[in-house]
């Protein structure tokens, strides 16, 4: 039993054989010649005289065959005019020569049509096969014509081509689709009207709508110029019923977005706004009011005077008045700085009123021939600038400025530095550049707070050995005679005097302590005024000088001139490679450059 059920189920799964449908039977076409009628298009209101004006060149020739069974022959298109107002044809195409027995077919092309157009020779095969179906469609179209006429009054005319009903045969659908596809809506879309309540407009009803011909909007690719609205004929309208249009139900208005303006820099925007405000402002006329003049009686008792007169002051008096005013303002407002730079003062103004409060004083670029004594009374002065003045000497009383930290006296005529200058314990910066200074005293070692020393443009040949005891941060000595070619010349020594040699011999051997009687003349020669830079003993006279260089203060080959007491000290320092300075003693390396090449016999001194 199970085998039978399985066999029956298996037989049901076989695929069914499908038979290919037979083609439909087409009716036999009659072998009868069909005449071609002249089809006229256009508006019904166009006169017949305008149609007769077409020349033979402005027609389309279509030849109809004798029988349907014969092969179709191609049509010959001579010329198609797209614009009646122009005399010259737009294009001429001759594909085949004109055969005999050709009938002319007049086909009117709208002015706005452009591109290729295909004129069918006969009805399509679908119209011959489905003739009954087409007739039913035609009846349905006729019943809908009345509804279409009503829709024309309601819908806006956009890209619409209305053809007259005088055509003998309807155009095939392929041709209508070809013409409709050639037009492109290039205009802007209709903007909806704003929503306004209770607004009614009365318009006349259009009756003969189908008699009017509406030309579609020309495409952007069409080269045919469109006639202006003033040249076009007005449509025929008849005043009939009145239609009331209520715009209360229209959609609300939408505001267009504001265009994005190009960005401008803020400076340009400010300038443009200023220009616009000047243009908008109206210039008000200046009102001139005439005041009545007072007439004086000549017989009246009136006192007349010249009033105040300007007194012509000299340049020096004017400058002195300005400096006095600056000092008064400094005193009133409690200021602690005065700047008289570039006043060309011949003398310093009185500074006693601000002697205790002044900290900064600048007297640069003036005409001070002497060091101003008024500055010495400024007890709390810390910065003093006397640059570019014809000062020739610095008084030793400068040591009264105990708190002076920065002293600048460059571009003057200073020849030497006083001993009182080296008593300023708080001095940090000293600028004596471009002066006539020839040497720097060894007492500079007392300025233990000195950090910056500037001696540019001076006549110095070397630095004293006391500079090795300082803690300088910056040392400047450009445009000087400290270069190595001048070292040998500046190391020449004069022969010592006999009195100096004898005094040195007596002191070193302590003979002045052994002798009970020292004459007064001998005691006068035994007094020493300086010490030896090598043995630190007494030195009589100038001694012997030698220049040795060392690398110090971040500079290389800084020349140091040592003054020794005797020939023995001279030979020792010449052969030594270091020197001890300071307390505790600091070992400073000396460069063995030019002294190794010289011999003792070449030393320029005499015994």
Curated annotation (Swiss-Prot):
Keywords on record: Leucine-rich repeat, Repeat
SMART domains: LRR_TYP (SM00369)
One Gene Ontology term from the biological process aspect of the record: intracellular signal transduction
Keyword check for Secreted: no
Per-repeat ranges for LRR: 357-378, 380-401, 403-424, 426-447, 449-470, 471-497, 498-524
Keyword Repeat recorded: yes
Residues of the signal peptide: none
Gene3D superfamilies hit by this protein: Ribonuclease Inhibitor
Top-level taxon of the source organism: Eukaryota
Name of the protein: Leucine-rich repeat-containing protein 63
Species this chain originates from: Rattus norvegicus
Gene that encodes it: Lrrc63
């Amino acid at each position: 039993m199970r085998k039978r059920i399985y066999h029956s189920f298996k037989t049901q799964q076989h695929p069914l054989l499908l038979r290919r449908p037979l083609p439909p039977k087409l009716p036999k076409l009659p072998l009868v010649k069909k005449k071609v009628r002249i089809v006229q298009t256009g508006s019904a209101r166009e006169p017949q005289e305008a149609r007769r004006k077409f020349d033979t060149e402005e027609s389309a020739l279509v030849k109809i065959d004798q029988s349907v069974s014969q092969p179709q022959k191609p049509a010959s298109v001579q010329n198609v005019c797209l614009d009646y107002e122009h005399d010259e044809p737009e294009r001429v195409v001759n594909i085949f020569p004109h055969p005999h027995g050709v009938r002319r077919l007049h086909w009117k092309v709208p002015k706005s049509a452009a591109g290729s157009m295909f004129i069918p020779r006969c009805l399509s095969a679908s119209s011959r096969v489905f003739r009954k179906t087409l007739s039913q469609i035609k009846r349905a179209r006729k019943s809908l014509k009345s509804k279409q006429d009503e829709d024309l009054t309601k819908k806006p005319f956009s890209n619409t081509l209305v053809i007259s009903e005088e055509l003998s045969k309807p155009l095939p659908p392929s041709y209508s689709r070809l013409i409709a596809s050639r037009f492109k809506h290039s205009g802007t879309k209709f903007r909806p009207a704003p929503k306004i309540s209770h607004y009614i407009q009365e318009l006349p009803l259009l009756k003969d709508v189908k008699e009017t011909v509406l030309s579609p909007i020309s495409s952007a690719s069409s080269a045919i110029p469109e006639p202006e609205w003033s040249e076009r004929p007005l449509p025929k309208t008849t005043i009939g019923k009145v239609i009331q249009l209520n715009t209360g139900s229209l959609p609300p208005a939408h505001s267009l977005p504001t265009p994005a303006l190009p960005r401008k820099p803020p400076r340009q925007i400010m300038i443009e706004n200023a220009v616009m405000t000047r243009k908008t402002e109206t210039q008000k006329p200046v009102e001139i009011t005439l005041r009545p003049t007072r007439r004086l009686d000549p017989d009246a008792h009136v006192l007349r005077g010249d009033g105040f007169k300007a007194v012509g002051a000299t340049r020096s008096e004017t400058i002195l008045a300005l400096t006095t005013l600056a000092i008064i303002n400094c005193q009133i407002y409690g200021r602690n700085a005065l700047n008289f730079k570039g006043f060309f003062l011949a003398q310093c103004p009185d500074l006693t009123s601000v002697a205790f409060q002044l900290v900064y004083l600048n007297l640069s670029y003036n005409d001070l021939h002497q060091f101003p004594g008024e500055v010495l009374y400024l007890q709390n002065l810390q910065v003093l600038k006397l640059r570019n003045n014809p000062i020739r000497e610095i008084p030793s009383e400068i040591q009264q400025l105990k708190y002076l930290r920065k002293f600048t006296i460059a571009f003057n005529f200073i020849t030497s530095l006083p001993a009182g200058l080296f008593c300023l314990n708080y001095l940090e910066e000293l600028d004596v550049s471009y002066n006539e200074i020839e040497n720097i005293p060894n007492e500079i070692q007392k300025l233990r707070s000195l950090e910056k020393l500037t001696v540019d443009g001076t006549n110095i040949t070397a630095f004293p050995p006391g500079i090795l005891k300082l803690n300088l941060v910056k040392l400047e000595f450009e445009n000087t005679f400290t270069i190595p070619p001048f070292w040998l010349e500046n190391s020449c020594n004069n022969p010592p005097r006999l009195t100096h040699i004898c005094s040195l011999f007596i002191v070193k051997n302590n003979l002045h302590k052994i002798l009970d009687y020292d004459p007064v003349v001998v005691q006068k020669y035994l007094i020493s005024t300086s010490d030896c830079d090598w043995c630190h003993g007494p030195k009589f006279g100038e001694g012997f000088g030698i220049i040795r260089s060392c690398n110090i203060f971040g500079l290389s080959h800084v020349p140091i001139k040592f003054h020794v007491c005797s020939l023995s000290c001279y030979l020792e320092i010449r052969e030594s490679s270091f020197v001890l300075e300071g307390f505790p003693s600091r070992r400073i390396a000396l460069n063995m450059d030019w002294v190794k090449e010289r011999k003792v016999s070449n030393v320029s001194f005499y015994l």
